[in-house]
């Protein structure tokens, strides 16, 4: 028997799926607010670092969830790999005139891995793979230019601020994205040597530099780093 509090918590969250927070445009592609009030939507654009946390839709309606990945990587991503973390409505190419969100963009790579596993279709993975690689390369070049396996440069995130210096929170996204990408690439028989080396460095940094024995921490750094907008805007 499931405890009544658990039932209430699950039901209360799943009702969002039938609210105006979530809808589909004319061609079936999903587009979401972050939430909604009685007369308005709150924070537009299927925000990547907010929808990182949603796990119901990919398991209940995986085809619909995949349209979010296809929008993020095929439509809202620039040729240089910069990904807008809010997509336009109607869904269409967007101006890349704001920071990329480190947690949103890296989280999207892990979500591709998840969605591929749920779908079980290698053709879909092959279709999106080069876009995912382009996205990850942008993240590496922008936030880990020294190839240390750590998100070190100032980076925008879900708190609508820039983190200055490595943190357990954002670096876990980086580690996870590297691990997901290595797994996908190896499945497709790609040479993943460079990315696996970065993954090993990232795991080592997480365990030995960002864990104090009790908590994962942030190593605040305000010197010897680039100004955040210079790399995040194109």
Task: Identify the function of each model-found stretch.
Residues 1-55, 59:
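An acidic-aromatic substrate-binding cleft motif
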Residues 1-10, 180-195:
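N-terminal leader/propeptide and maturation segments of large enzyme subunits in energy/redox metabolism
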Residues 196-206:
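Short amphipathic alpha-helical coiled-coil/interface segments
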Residues 156-164:
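Short beta-alpha connecting loops at secondary-structure transitions
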Residues 223-234:
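Single conserved hydrophobic/aromatic residue that forms the stacking wall/gate
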Residues 29, 40-150, 165-185, 196:
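Aromatic-rich carbohydrate-recognition surfaces in CAZymes
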Residues 144-152, 208-214:
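C-terminal ends of transmembrane alpha-helices
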